């Protein structure tokens, strides 16, 4: 199965990239502070825990995000969204991944989930994407579909902050 959009991998170097004809998404959420919070957040993002804790179905060909891993996200038990991991990053202060849409996904585009620890020790989650409607129901949803994408991105931050709360108190 091939990707349903171009340019594949565009988010790797620039999380704010948005090619012509796509809608941008960029949500940054403060998760906490310190190395323990960063390590916990990175693991939760790389091992699908954040997504599973949100109540979405994750069917992946590997237990951890890695390039070329296929992932199908199921929303509300009904909407299946097949994707493939394009890139991952695991550095001392930055960890995460991005996937691109495959045939059958209601949208086409790319989405990244990146945890970073800034110089002052603050840990952030950035959810960044560029997308446009692919299916008839995503097109019919128009602005409401984009609103749901933003709500999902904000919820990622809330859920990850909750998952990291124990690490913040250690």
Q: Which residues are covered by each model-predicted region?
A:
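Beta-strand secondary-structure signal
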Residues: 26-28, 70-72, 98, 112-114, ...
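Beta-strand/loop substructures that line and gate deep hydrophobic ligand-binding cavities in soluble
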Residues: 102-147
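Short, intrinsically disordered, mixed-charge
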Residues: 39-50, 104, 120, 158, ...
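A conserved amphipathic terminal alpha-helix motif
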Residues: 132-170
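Residues that form or immediately flank small-molecule/cofactor binding pockets and catalytic motifs
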Residues: 10, 90, 132
């Amino acid at each position: 199965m091939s990707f349903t959009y171009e340019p594949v991998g565009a988010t790797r170097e620039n999380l704010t990239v948005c090619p012509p004809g796509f809608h941008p998404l960029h949500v940054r959420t403060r998760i906490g502070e310190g190395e323990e919070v960063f390590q916990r957040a990175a693991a939760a993002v790389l091992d699908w825990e954040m997504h599973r804790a949100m109540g979405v179905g994750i069917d992946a060909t590997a237990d951890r995000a890695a390039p070329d891993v296929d992932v199908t996200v199921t929303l509300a038990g009904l909407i299946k969204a097949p994707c493939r991991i394009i890139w991952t990053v695991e550095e001392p202060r930055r960890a995460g991944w991005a996937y691109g849409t495959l045939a059958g996904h209601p949208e086409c585009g790319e989405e990244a989930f990146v945890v970073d620890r800034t110089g002052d020790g603050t840990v952030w989650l950035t959810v960044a994407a560029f997308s446009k409607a692919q299916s008839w129901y995503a097109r019919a949803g128009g602005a409401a579909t984009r609103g749901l994408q933003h709500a999902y991105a904000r919820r990622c931050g809330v859920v990850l902050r909750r998952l990291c709360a124990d690490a913040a108190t250690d």
